[in-house]
């Protein structure tokens, strides 16, 4: 038992790590977000991926599929937020004629998020009072890049000059 305790004590500085299913590059990106954004920053992030976003970055996000609310009002808002993040895919799924399947739902929400264009992202940033949009390197937007870390890109809000 003492060997196990020693091993655990040595691992504390590296926590969280792959043992907690945390990709080292994601840990670096989340550390950067925590160290370089305001504590009250709202960061738009993928609703399915990076379920540990809030825990790792100590920043707010819009909605995560795994973090389901418990009150009627909050549940309605949750689905509205997922619909916003998926470019309208949630409404199509839940009000369509097809039977609901978890895999199909997750796939549609993920695809919807990954297909958001620059104008849609800017609209989300305005709607949710966010200055940041976190995505992966396959999601190209015409927005300023604030920071990159391996496959992760943090975009910033594009401000227009007032005349």
Which residues make up each language-model segment?
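Transmembrane alpha-helical segments
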Residues: 1-21
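Aromatic/acidic, Gly/Pro-rich catalytic loop(s) in extracytoplasmic/lumenal soluble domains
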Residues: 107, 111-163
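Short periplasmic/luminal acceptor-recognition loop of GT-C membrane glycosyltransferases, typified by
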Residues: 7, 20-104, 124-139
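Short glycine/proline- and acidic residue-enriched helix-loop micro-motifs
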Residues: 12-16, 103-108
